[in-house]
Amino acid sequence: TRSDGLVIGNVGGGVVANAVLGEKGVQYDLDKLPFIGSPYSATHYVFATRRELGLTNLEKLRSATGIRIGAQSVGHTNYTIGRMFAALLGLKDSKYVTGYSIPERDVALLRGEIDAIANTDDFYARNPEWIDKKLVDFHVVMEIPKGLKHPLFSNLPDIENFAKSDSARKLLSLFRLLRLTGSPFILPPATQKDRADAIKEALRKAFKDAEFVKEYRKVVGEDPTPLLPEENERAIRDLPRDPETIDLFKKFAGAGPLPSL
C-alpha cells in the first residue's frame, strides 16, 4: 500500500455502515483507515403525515391507529428511520409500505395510498410547495449533527426527546453517526503521518474556501456542510458497536415486527 500521500479515496457512507454492522464481504478494518473529512454531513430527517388525515399535532398522531408509512425499500435509510420514529412515538399498529421510487411514494402520499413518510430536509428545499400549500403536517425531526437546528423545522422536537432508555439512545446515536460521516475521504492505512497531516490541513482550507462553496453549490444544488478531519475521526470513534445495539439496528432495518423501545 502506498504511503506517500498521493492516493486519496472517496467512499460512500456504506463503507462505514457495512463494517460496523458486520455485513458479509467486508475485508477492511475500519479503525485502520484514516478518515480525513467529508464535504457534507448535516441533514435533518422529518416525519410527516398527509394533511387530510387531520393529525395536526403529536397528541393526535400518537392516538391514531394503523398509520401506513411509505418508503423505498426494506433497509433504506428512510424506511429505517421511519420505523424508529414510529417506535419511539408509540404509534399503534403502524404499517410499512415499500417498493416505491421517491416520485411514486410522493404521489402515493398525496393520493392517500399511504399516510406518512420520513424524509430529509433537502426534499422540502427542492419541493417548497409541500410547505407553502400545507400538504403535510410535520411532527418530529432527527437533527444530524445533534443540536443543529433547521430554520424550517426548529419548532419540532428532536426524536431523541422520546428515547427513554439507554438502548434507544444508543440506537439513535448509531443512526446519527452513520449518517454524519457523509461521503468521507480516506487515506491508505500506511500513509506517513506528515503526509496525512498535510492533506488534512489542505482539506480544512478547501472546505473554508469561498470558491469551493460556490462550486459545490453549483454542482450539487445545495450548500456544503463539511465534516472536518478531527470531527470525522471522532464520529467513527464514537459509533456504538456493542452487539445489542447492532442487533437492534438490524431489526429496525429489516422486515420483521417493529421492535419495542
Features from the language model and the residues they span:
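Hinge/capping helix and adjacent helix->loop/strand transition within the periplasmic-binding protein
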Residues: 1-7, 15, 19-111, 163-170, ...
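Mature extracytoplasmic/periplasmic domains
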Residues: 143-148, 204, 208, 212-237
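Extracellular/periplasmic bilobal clamshell ligand-binding domains
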Residues: 210, 228-261
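Paired acidic/hydrophobic, glycine-rich loop segments that form the ligand-binding mouth/hinge
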Residues: 4-12, 70, 114-121, 138-140
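Short, hydrophobic secondary-structure boundary micro-motifs
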Residues: 8, 139, 214-216, 248-249
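C-terminal lobe and pocket-closing loops
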Residues: 126-207, 244, 255-261
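Short helices/loops that flank or line small-molecule/ion binding pockets
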Residues: 1-4, 84-88, 103-118, 122-134, ...
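Solvent-exposed coil/turn segments that connect beta secondary-structure elements
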Residues: 13-15, 51-53, 121-123, 144-146
